[in-house]
Structure formats: C-alpha cells, structure tokens
C-alpha cells in the first residue's frame, strides 16, 4: 500500500530539471537551514551521550577511549581458505571477525546435497560439521577475538559448533564474545533464506535468547537487520521503521515465551546499512537509537538501562557499488564509513571496491580495512562525541526520519505486528526500489560512472 504524499517515505519521481532536492525517503531538502528548523525541546531530545534517550550515542566517551570494532566480513570456498583470510585480516589490524556462510549452510544443507550444485562455497564458507568449524578458526584464540556469524535459520546449530570449538581450545562458553544474526523475519521480507514457517522460526530465535542467557551470557543473541532491506531497495525511513518493527516482534515473542525483558534485551544488537547520503545516514542512526530507547522503556517497561541502548553494526552499502569504474567505490565506501562513525556505530565493515565484480581480492580487502583506520586515526571523526549534534540540517533530518518511521511502525502494529505485515513490508520496499531505478533511468539521481561521467572504453581491473 503506497503512503500518501503527506506521509511519504520514498522520494518522488520528478525528473532531472525539477529544482527541488529530496532524500531517498522523500524528505524535501531546503536550500538553507536555520535555528527555526531545530525541533522543540532539543536538549531533552538529545540528552547526554551514554544517557537516555541515547540520541548522541550509547557510551559517554564513544571513541575517545576505544575505536569501534573493525569487523571485516569474510568467508569463501573452504574452511581452510577462509581461515587464511581471517588470519590475513587480523594481521593487518582487524579487531574482530565476521563470518560469511555459503547458501547451503544458510539453508541447513550439507555440501553433498544434490540441491547445492554450483552453490557450495560461492557466497561464503561451507560448514558441514564441527571439523569445518575447527579448521576455520585454527590458530585463532576465541577468548581474544569476537566473531559475528551471519547465519539465521540454522543459527543455533552453528553457534553450538562454535561453542564446541571454543571448549576444545579451553575457552569456557561464558567467555565467548560475538553475535549470531539470527534474524529470521528479514529473510521472509528481503532475502528468502528460511526453512520453517514464520511463527516456528521466531520461536527458534527466542529459544536462542534463553540458551545464551544460561550458557553464553556475553553473546549477542540476534542482530536485527535493516541492512538487507536497504540492499533490496528500501529508503532510510523504511530501514529504520521495519528494523525496529521486527525488533518489537522479537521482544514481544520472547516475553510471550516467558522470558524477562531485562534478562535478554541487553544482548540484542542491530545491523544497519551505510548508504551514500552522509547527512541522512547520520540522522538515521541517531533517530533509530532514540526511538528504540523509548520503545524499550515505555512500550515494554524495561528498567535496565542496558535494555534501552540500541547497539549496532554497520556495513557499507553493497548496492551502491558499481562495476563501472570500480575504483570510484573506494570513495563511496569511505564516505559511508565516515557517516557510520559520525552516527555512532559500535562496529563497522567497509566493503571492498571490487565487490560488484567478484569476491574481494586481498588488495581490496586491505584497502577497505585501511579506509576504516584512516577514518579512525586521521579524519577527526573519533575525536569528539556525536560531531553533527546541533547542526540545523542534521537535527531537522533526525526529527523527520523519526516522525515518518513512527508512522510506518504504527501501520505494522495495525496489521498485527511484523509476522502479519510481511507482505506489506515487502510491497513497500519493492515500490521504493522501483523508484530508485526510475530516478536513475531519467537522470534525476546521478551515479558517477554509470549515468554521468561515463567512459566509452572502461578499464577492466585485473
């Protein structure tokens, strides 16, 4: 169902000659912002860093004491080859690991299953047994490195294998640190890699909440993901709204299963996309943090301040990378990573510039990691907390994103929550994706090297 013009969440198609400027969420950008664009009660809306409503960040000092975790997503072919890449990243300064699995593993299939022909090791590492997990983490001390696993339907099985490898290393389960994505709802909405119907799959998700509370208390039990919605074509407002709506669904399901909110909510984490519009992205992260704090405190009655904090990982936008003039992607990734840092991310993956063409080479992976290090040590973005706070433009954007996202969440609530609203969210994202393509097609939106500054005889990288 399309939204009305008054409550638009995607940009209109107006043509390249229209003087108006819009974000992808349909927010019209004024030529100039001033103090009368600031929201009322701004000091209360902002709060202090590390304090409710966490608009300015979940920690008081943010990056002054410690930079975000530089967690590069990697995994391909065999466990041995993935292990080599993990060692390479750690040796070059990565401070955490992020494990990519192939599609058969994501669907709970063994590599020798006939249905897996042509897919084994293609999009990530194939893990068929504990032997593969042992090889993948050979020589990597699991008490020193935190690992994020991008796995959903069979998340509990892969976490158990990881736990057992840790046990073999002499690392007690209570000392393991990391995250399982474990977000099955976004699979129905955006990716399609699910095994069971939604209701049963959500139960498995919340079962892992209970298991980790008892066995692996430092583990983040879920990474509630908006990243994939944005990759599928949603706007920034839709990314915030549908991610938090799914978060609401998981919290409610866990409570309905008998869990106490303050016993599982502090280990919930989120996963967002870092897109091209720096100012909108900074505003998006700030709005999401403020909204989640209120949802947890007011809607669910959480008392523990840790339950109010939206902690999130960011990956730069894969969908923004171009096969044409791929070196341009280095600049795109740097801007997206900069926005994520200025927006207060807890960890970050920066994409390789060649990922529109193939799995990243070692050179591309190193440049991506160096990009984070330059942001952290040279740009000044880490020197002060929430550097865009008080900006007329960013504060106005933060407020507008929050207002529009709240309206979308209300619509999901009216439909009975995320499980019942799967088709609604899919349709909204598809309409937004169509708008993206139309705006590019008519040159309303510009992609350098694709529909402007095109080279007739492009150089193909090695």
Which positions does each model-derived feature cover?
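Catalytic alpha/beta active-site cores
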Residues: 2-275, 299, 306-313, 341, ...
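Short beta-alpha connecting loops at secondary-structure transitions
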Residues: 118-122, 186-196, 229-234, 272-277, ...
